[in-house]
From Swiss-Prot:
This is Thermostable celloxylanase. One of its GO terms (molecular function) is cellulase activity. The gene is xynB. Optimum temperature is 80 degrees Celsius. Belongs to the glycosyl hydrolase 10 (cellulase F) family. The active site is at E185 (proton donor), E293 (nucleophile). It comes from Thermoclostridium stercorarium (Clostridium stercorarium). Active toward xylan, carboxymethylcellulose, P-nitrophenyl-beta-D-xylopyranoside and P-nitrophenyl-beta-D-cellobioside.
Length: 387
C-alpha cells in the first residue's frame, strides 16, 4: 500500500519579519517511511538513467567504497566518479618525489571496469597540500622570507615544484580522466583583493594559477577540460571576484574551459535562482559549468544542533522539495551545465557528519542503509509526491 506526502503550512511571525515554514508530514516511498511497501531494491530506478537526456550524474568516492554494498550503489546510480580525497596533493605526493598512486589507481580501475567517466580533484589547493611545497632549500617556510632576492628564488622554486608535480600527475592520468579541477578555492572575499591569502598567493601572487593551467594543458593536451573550482559561487561578491579573475586569465590566453560550482548548500539557502544566475554569468564567457560537490545539509550554517537518529519528516520533505527545485532548474539549463556531481552517495559517509561540527547530517539522496530518501524520489519520480 502506498503512503504519501501530506503538507500543512503554518505562518510563523518573528521579530525579524514573516516567514513561511512547512510543517510537513512525509510518508514517501523509501526506507522506513519512504518506500512503497511493495518496492524492492532491484525496482529502484537508476539515478544516472533518469538524467541520461540531460547530463551525467556523478559522485565522490573513496578507494574503500569500490567493493561491497556501497559499490553496488555507485554502479547502479552514477556514471561519473571523482576521488573525494585520493587525488589531492597530500595523498598523491606526501613528500617531494614520493608519489603514492595506489588509492587513485584503484578508483580509476573501478571507473573503467564500470564504464564511468572520471573527474580529477584537485591539482592545486591551499588545504591537503604537503608543507614541503612551500619550504625553501633550507627547509624554512618561504612566506617568512623578507630578502627580495631570496623571495624571488623561492617564487621560482615553488612554481617549478608545481610544474613538476602537475606534469607527473597529468601524464599518468590524462588518458583516463578528461575533466580536471586545476585550482580549487582561490577566492576569499575577506582577504586583500579577494584572493585567498594562501602560501601560493603570498609567494607568487596569481601567477601560480596561470602556471597551473598552462602546465596542465601542456601535459594533458587539448582533449582534457580544465576547470577552476570554488564554493559559494552563487554569492554575488565572491562570484564577481571569481568572474573578473577568470576573465582576466582568459584575456591572457590561459586555457580555462569551465567553472566548477561546488554547491554545498542547505535546505534553506541559497536561493536556486542565485545558483543559476552564477552559472549563466560564467557561460557568458563561453565557459562550461559543472556542479562539482553537491550536497544539501539539513541544518542552516549557523545551526549547531543535532537531530541524531530522529530527523523530523518535515525536514526531509523540505530537502526533497528543494532538491526538486534545483534539479528542475538545472535541467532547464542543460546546455550550459555539463555534469552534476554529488559529494558522496550515502548519508552514512558524508563529510558533513563531521563539519562544521560532529553530528548526524543527511545531505545526500541515499540514507545510512543505502536506501533512497524522499529527495531521491523528488528528482527521479516526482509523481511519488502528492500534495
Amino acid at each position: 500500500m502506498n503512503k504519501f506526502l501530506n503538507k500543512k503550512w503554518s505562518l510563523i511571525l518573528t521579530m525579524g519579519g514573516i516567514f513561511l515554514m512547512a510543517t510537513l508530514s512525509l510518508i514517501f516511498a523509501t526506507g522506513k517511511k519512504a518506500f512503497n511497501d511493495q518496492t524492492s531494491a532491484e525496482d529502484i530506478p537508476s539515478l544516472a538513467e533518469a538524467f541520461r537526456d540531460y547530463f551525467p550524474i556523478g559522485a565522490a568516492i573513496e578507494p574503500g567504497y569500490t567493493t561491497g554494498q556501497i559499490a553496488e550503489l555507485y554502479k547502479k546510480h552514477v556514471n561519473m566518479l571523482v576521488a573525494e580525497n585520493a587525488m589531492k596533493p597530500a595523498s598523491l605526493q606526501p613528500t617531494e618525489g614520493n608519489f603514492q598512486w595506489a588509492d587513485a589507481d584503484r578508483i580509476v580501475q573501478f571507473a573503467k571496469e564500470n564504464g564511468m567517466e572520471l573527474r580529477f580533484h584537485t591539482l592545486v589547493w591551499h588545504n591537503q597540500t604537503p608543507t614541503g611545497f612551500s619550504l625553501d632549500k633550507e627547509g624554512k617556510p618561504m612566506v617568512e622570507e623578507t630578502d627580495p632576492q631570496k623571495r624571488e628564488e623561492n617564487r621560482k622554486l615553488l612554481l617549478q615544484r608545481l610544474e613538476n608535480y602537475i606534469r607527473a600527475v597529468v601524464l599518468r592520468y590524462k588518458d583516463d580522466i578528461k575533466s580536471w579541477d586545476v585550482v580549487n578555492e582561490v577566492i576569499e572575499p575577506n582577504d586583500p583583493g579577494g584572493m585567498r591569502n594562501s602560501p601560493w598567493y603570498q609567494i607568487t601572487g596569481t601567477e601560480y594559477i596561470e602556471v597551473a593551467f598552462r602546465a596542465t594543458r601542456e601535459a594533458g593536451g587539448s582533449d582534457i577540460k580544465l576547470y577552476i573550482n570554488d564554493y559559494n559561487t552563487d554569492d554575488p561578491v565572491k562570484r564577481d571576484i571569481l568572474y573578473e579573475l577568470v576573465k582576466n586569465l582568459l584575456e591572457k590566453g590561459v586555457p580555462i574551459d569551465g567553472v566548477g560550482h561546488q554547491t554545498h548548500i542547505d535546505i534553506y539557502n541559497p536561493p536556486v535562482e542565485r545558483i543559476i544566475e552564477s552559472i549563466k554569468k560564467f557561460a557568458g564567457l563561453g565557459l562550461d559549468n559543472i556542479i562539482t560537490e553537491l550536497d544539501m545539509s539539513i541544518y542552516s550554517w549557523n545551526d549547531r544542533s543535532d537531530y541524531g537518529d530522529s530527523i523530523p519528516d518535515y525536514i526531509l520533505t523540505l530537502q526533497a522539495k528543494r532538491y526538486q527545485e534545483l534539479f528542475d532548474a538545472l535541467k532547464e539549463n542543460k546546455d550550459i551545465v555539463s555534469a552534476v556531481v554529488f559529494w558522496g552517495i550515502s548519508d552514512k559517509y558524508s563529510w558533513l557528519n563531521g563539519f562544521p561540527v560532529k553530528r548526524t547530517n543527511a545531505p545526500l539522496l541515499f540514507d545510512r542503509n543505502f536506501m533512497p530518501k524522499p529527495a531521491f524520489w523528488a528528482i527521479v519520480d516526482p509523481s511519488r509526491l502528492r500534495e
